[in-house]
């Protein structure tokens, strides 16, 4: 299991509860995604009622909205559309806002490739 040093203790307990009962494959995907984000910079993991937010210390930068049987669904909220990519399965503008949510479905650890790492870095610094 990944070390969540920047995540407050009470949120670590919530996270454990959130992850309980998930498949070994899904947990491996989750750990890999978090580990890859930690290579970019320090992050904190914030579980909520229906999703898990990841922050860079200033703001939440991505949201894991679904931990399926064999996948993760991750939303990257950007201020603009990034249409020219192969990693996002859907891009939707938030009504009445400039925010565009970019949806990434992770099925294998290899899905976190150089292209996605570029968008992870944009999210981290944005």
Where are the regions a protein language model picked out?
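Charge-dense, helix-prone N-terminal extensions
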Residues: 1-126
């Amino acid at each position: 299991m990944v070390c969540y040093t920047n995540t407050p203790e009470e949120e670590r307990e919530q996270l454990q509860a959130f992850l309980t009962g998930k498949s070994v494959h899904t947990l491996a995907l989750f750990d890999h995604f978090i580990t890859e984000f930690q290579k970019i910079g320090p992050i904190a993991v914030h579980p909520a009622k229906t999703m898990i937010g990841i922050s860079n210390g200033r703001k939440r930068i991505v949201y894991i909205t679904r931990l399926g049987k064999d996948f993760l669904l991750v939303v990257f909220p950007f201020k603009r559309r990034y249409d020219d990519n192969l990693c996002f399965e859907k891009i939707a503008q938030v009504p009445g806002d400039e925010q565009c949510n970019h949806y990434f479905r992770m099925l294998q650890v290899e899905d976190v490739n150089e292209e996605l790492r570029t968008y992870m870095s944009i999210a981290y610094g944005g």
